[in-house]
Structure formats: structure tokens, C-alpha cells
Amino acid sequence: MLNRNYRGLLGTKLGMTQVWDANNRVVPVTVIQAGPNVVTQVKTPDSDGYSAVQLGYGEIDPRRINKPMRGHFETSGATPRRHLVELRTADAGNYRPGQQLTGEVFDAGQVVDVTGTSKGKGFAGVMKRHGFKGLGAGHGVERKHRSPGSVGGCATPGRVFKGLRMAGRMGHDRVTVAGLTIHAVDTERGFLLIKGAIPGPDGGLVFVRSAAKRPAPEPAAPVAAAAAGTGEEASA
């Protein structure tokens, strides 16, 4: 059973730039247009067997929506959206269909995971695609310098094993970069400034959510308040 509260948003990668931090150091950041997202469905353990929120992002011509999806959006009271994503979170009951979400759901310094579609490289050889060494530059090698070499024996095994790394289309894969830090949140323009690079080209769709491997720290304020109260009583 999921027992963590996650935050997530669909957005658009705008590009990279650099900013100065509090220590006057240059920080490379990626700018993301985060939202606005709209809640199109709320899933609960009673009705769906698990707790999740479905988010919609991006405008689309309503005439391009089929009847099942049109009914789905009408149920939530939201206008049709181009992209949909599901975010599993324990506090899905706090959301309501039609609710608008912006970059304010995140805080500066928060650690997030970013998912996007990597840039397509087209058909690539094994040296570029898999980092093969290639064959020798001389010593009798003729026009095979970037070849992978042997891919299987003649009699044994007499075939090519499944999954053997070969040349082929490179890139355009779903990639997740984990453990990135939000440098700043621009609430006026709806921008997220995330330290480092994220997958995909400028203008590509990305999904930003709370880091899965780094749970949020427990708040220390109640503990400090309780300790202070104990001290006052003891002194009295």
C-alpha cells in the first residue's frame, strides 16, 4: 500500500541557462514551463483499488477528441487536454476533479525525478550506440574499422543470441533522471528552474514528480515545540 504523498506536474522543457546562487557560483539550470495542469480523475482504493490522481496538460482541438475521451473530460468538468498522466499518491483524496495545479506545488531545494523522451539520433552504429571499441586501424583490417566484429559462432551456438547489442535506431527513448534539485520556482510565470540537464529537446514534454528514492524529511518543528514546553514546565 502506498503511504507517501507525491507531487507531480506535466510541463514543457524550454531550454537551459545559468543563474547565480547565494554563494555567487554559476549554476546551470533547465527551465521548465510547469503546468498549468488540471485534475481529470481521482482514483481511490474503494473505487479503483489504489490511490492516484490523473493530470491533464496541453490544449487540443475538441474536434480531435473521440467520444469516450470527450465523456471522460466532461465528467471531470475540464476542457480536453492533449496529454494525460497518472500520479500515484497517498493523499489523492485531497484533490478534486477540475482542480488547477501550477508550479507552486514544488518548493525550492526539493529533490525531484524528471521523465522525458530523449533526443532521437537516427540509425547509429555500435561504436556510437553502445560504445564499442571497433576493430583495429591497421594490420590487415579493410573497411571494417567500425564493425562490431563477430556476433556468434558458426557451429556453436550456431545462432545469434537474443539481445545482442548491434547497430540500430538510437535515442527517442523514455528516460528518467533521478535526484535532481529544484533551484528556484517562478510562480508568476510558472517556471521551474532545475539544476542540471534533463532528457529531451527544447519544447519536449516532461513529467516532474517528487523523488521516489528520497523521502521527504519529517518536520522538526513539533518536536522542538514539545521540547520547549517541557523545559518551561520543568523550570516552573
From Swiss-Prot:
Alphabetical list of InterPro entries matching this protein: Ribosomal_uL3, Ribosomal_uL3_bac/org-type, Ribosomal_uL3_CS, Transl_B-barrel_sf
GO MF: rRNA binding; structural constituent of ribosome
Compositional bias segments (type: Low complexity): 221-236
GO CC annotation, single: cytosolic large ribosomal subunit
Gene Ontology BP annotations: translation
Pfam family, one: Ribosomal_L3
Annotated region described as Disordered, given as residue ranges: 215-236
Top-level lineage group: Bacteria
Entry keywords, A to Z: Ribonucleoprotein, Ribosomal protein, RNA-binding, rRNA-binding
Quaternary assembly: Part of the 50S ribosomal subunit. Forms a cluster with proteins L14 and L19.
PANTHER family registered for this protein in UniProt: 50S RIBOSOMAL PROTEIN L3, LARGE RIBOSOMAL SUBUNIT PROTEIN UL3C
Protein family membership: Belongs to the universal ribosomal protein uL3 family.
Described function: One of the primary rRNA binding proteins, it binds directly near the 3'-end of the 23S rRNA, where it nucleates assembly of the 50S subunit.
Protein name (record): Large ribosomal subunit protein uL3
Organism field: Parafrankia sp. (strain EAN1pec)
Lineage: Bacteria, Bacillati, Actinomycetota, Actinomycetes, Frankiales
